[in-house]
């Protein structure tokens, strides 16, 4: 990353009161903390695999300024993004499911509004994971370099015809596809002054909207330790579905099943942009994602 250029660009937009520091470096993005008189701003330099994020975030902020972080500046060509401080991640409070009762309908309303902008997002590089494209992408999960045991890959291979049927069923329900975050968990939803904001749109895609909750529900299981079948999941599902209309519970269940595979396919896309050394660490989390998909073959 061009640190000198980034420093100058940041100072064109805000007035730091101290040194700009690296918050974290990842293969897909570098984040810098910019101290300001009133708090902090956050600079993000996105890798090519997530180069669409600055424009997408700016577009969302222009339409939903109360639901995403304030965009202080963005540079599409260099894939740079400067955000205002959004408060505190809800994970700081232990990922309470009560907060998701509020966050999920707000997020669903954003998704519904973005249906009108789907083709524009695709034209500007947001990954295309529309359900009709997934069966052709499914074969990528069977590659020999995927970090699974042979018998696990065999299970995925045997499930391929059924997966195509499930995708066809989901498409037939005709729920409009739109932007979906694909990393919607407690570290990416922030709270401040009674507002909830969704951050970090770099894993987003255009897909079935309901698949977003694959990640949300996974973290409620793993972090909040809600057992599968806990009544909270039905309450949160219903809260999310309310802006979409009535009678969608079966469609939601189908989308969650298909979504487990879509999420794995999205992870594979990220993996393909990593070095061999970076893949070794990445694969520890990827195995979990893959095995949650394999569980849907039963």
Regions found by a protein language model. Give the residues of each.
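ATP-binding pocket architecture of kinase catalytic cores
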Residues: 23-24, 28-127
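A general structural signal marking secondary-structure boundaries and capping sites
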Residues: 64, 111-118, 145, 220, ...
């Amino acid at each position: 990353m061009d640190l000198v250029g980034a420093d100058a660009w940041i100072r064109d937009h805000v007035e730091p009161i101290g040194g700009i520091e690296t918050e974290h470096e990842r293969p897909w993005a570098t984040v810098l903390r910019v101290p300001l008189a009133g708090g902090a701003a956050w600079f993000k330099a996105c890798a090519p695999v997530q180069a669409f994020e600055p424009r997408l975030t700016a577009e969302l902020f222009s339409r939903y300024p109360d639901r995403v972080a304030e965009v202080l500046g963005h540079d599409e060509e260099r894939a740079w993004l400067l955000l205002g401080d959004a408060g505190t991640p809800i994970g700081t409070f232990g990922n309470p499911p009560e907060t998701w009762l509020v966050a999920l309908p707000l997020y669903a309303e954003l998704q519904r509004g973005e249906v009108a902008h789907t083709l524009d997002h695709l034209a500007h590089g947001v990954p295309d994971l529309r359900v009709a494209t997934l069966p052709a992408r499914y074969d990528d999960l069977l590659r020999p370099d995927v970090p699974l045991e042979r018998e696990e890959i065999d299970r995925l291979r045997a499930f391929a015809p059924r997966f195509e049927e499930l995708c066809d069923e989901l498409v037939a329900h005709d729920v409009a596809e739109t932007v979906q975050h694909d990393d919607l968990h407690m570290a990416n939803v922030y709270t401040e002054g009674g507002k909830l904001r969704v951050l970090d749109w770099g894993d987003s895609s255009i897909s079935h909207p309901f698949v977003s909750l694959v990640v949300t529900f996974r973290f409620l299981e793993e972090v909040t330790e809600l057992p599968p079948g806990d009544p909270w999941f039905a309450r949160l599902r219903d809260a999310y579905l309310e802006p979409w209309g009535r009678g969608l519970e079966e469609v939601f269940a189908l989308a969650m099943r298909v979504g487990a595979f879509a999420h794995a396919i999205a992870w594979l896309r990220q993996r393909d942009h990593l070095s061999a050394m970076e893949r070794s660490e990445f694969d520890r989390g990827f195995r979990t994602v893959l095995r949650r998909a394999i569980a849907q073959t039963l």
